[in-house]
Amino acid sequence: MKTTDRTAVAMGLDVHRQFSTVTARNAEGKIAWRERLEHEDRDDLRKHLATWPRGMPVILESSFGWEWMCEELEQAGLEPQLASSRKVAAWRNARGMAKSNRTDADLLSELGRQTDRWWQVWLPPPEVRDRREWMRYRMSLVGLQTGLKNRVHAILHRHGILHDFADLFGAPGRRMLTRLANDAKNPRLRESGRATLKGYLQLLDHLRRQIAVVTRTIYRHLRVTPQAKRLQGLPGVGPILAHTILAEVGDFGRFRSARHLSSYSLLAPRAFDTGEETDEAPKGRHVGHMGRRTLKWAWIEAGHGAVRRGGRFREVFDRYTDGGKQNRNRGYILVGHELCRTAYAISKKETEYRDDPPARPGSSKKGAASREHARRRRAKSQNSRPGTGQPDPPMVAVG
């Protein structure tokens, strides 16, 4: 490690698994020094970071390894800043530069001297990073549990074992599965199937205990803020989903509008057509792919509960799915999008959610409750079967 030049005003840090490449620039924009930081000895790394000028901006890419490095930089009195990896790559390609460790560090150090912050992304504080870690850990456990349940279903399908349980993994269903796994005389399940089923059930029990432990920890450590209470007032949003949304969003105020939050949540429709005279999209509109997939999952998951609850979100779902008869996945995405926009509005205005807000003075629009009542009256007049959105079959005269 080289001796630090005190005239440096900005630094670029290209972080890798075992080392980092550093480029420092002075006030004239010239390179003050370059060096390579080894990550093996953390104490030696901290001592060297302490020699850097305090308060100096250090720019890192928002990719692998930025979290722990930002913590080390903050402890050393430096000012870490995150740059969008996608924008840095586009800038490098526009300048015709080949990708290398030194090139990336040089480009990042140039960003620190620019007054325009087009490249900067939000750096979540430590409490938000901790919240994300807890919620993602629980999500990973639930995902493993779902995968094991699907494998148990596959075992029953392969052996032709049918059941009429609404929830196979409820108390009655688990008793049936336990009997199958322990009954060596049952001819419908071979020995290999019994051993596999028994192992899966043991893993499910272990996962269920782990999920219960982490859920209690989440409720104990995560503070119930006024913002979390407002989110839980939305239809379909419970405590876990509320904390998941807060963990991924961090601060609603960092988004300029509900459209920006929807785009970040991968729910905003966008078109990829050019040269059209109108705003129509012949190839159709699709959601984006650059954002928080966890947020997209959370909003759509809340959309399922909001549709079951009814109200204006059920009205949105029915409008785009013809009463739930076609393209239901698209309907849930639209409801999730509407929930996202509503959450942004109540967070910015710091108000509680109302299912039937009063109409603005002079507005001719009816409230959500009135629209829901009218929808139910229309469905009843059409003699439709409740819960399906489909009409009753016509009566056929016999004889």
Model-found features: residue ranges?
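Gly/Thr-rich phosphate-binding beta-strand-loop-beta motif of the actin/hexokinase/Hsp70
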Residues: 2-26, 108, 141
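Short glycine-rich, Thr/Ser-proximal phosphate-binding strand/loop in the N-terminal lobe
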Residues: 19-42
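Short, basic/hydrophobic alpha-helical segments
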Residues: 40-57
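Short alpha-helix plus adjacent loop in nuclease-associated cores
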Residues: 81-120, 133, 140, 175-176, ...
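Short, charge-rich amphipathic alpha-helices with coiled-coil/heptad character
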Residues: 114-132, 183-186
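Glycine-rich, often acidic, oxyanion-interacting loops/wings at catalytic, nucleic-acid
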Residues: 134-230
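Phosphate-backbone recognition surface of nucleic-acid-processing proteins
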Residues: 230-233, 239-240, 244-328
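Low-complexity, acidic/Ser/Thr- and charged residue-rich accessory regions of DNA metabolism proteins
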Residues: 317-399
